[in-house]
Amino acid sequence: MKVRVYVTLKDGILDPQGKAVKHSLHTLGYSSVEDVRIGKYIELSLGEVSGEKLDSQIKEMCNKLLANTIVEDFRYEIEK
């Protein structure tokens, strides 16, 4: 089973990397770009875990390690 985890900065948190990428895109002529936010994409391959235990484990992994929940949000998708 595969789990895709998306980690993004919370609204209102300054994203200096996103601002630098936006500036570079404008320099390259992509002036229509209004904003850039940079995040993380993580793929997990898991053995068989079912139902509530699976959700619980994924949330625990994100809260303990994969995301800094003070400044980041996360969401995930499960592909069985």
Residue ranges and their predicted role:
Residues K2-R4, T8-Y41, Q57-K80:
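Long, contiguous binding/interaction regions
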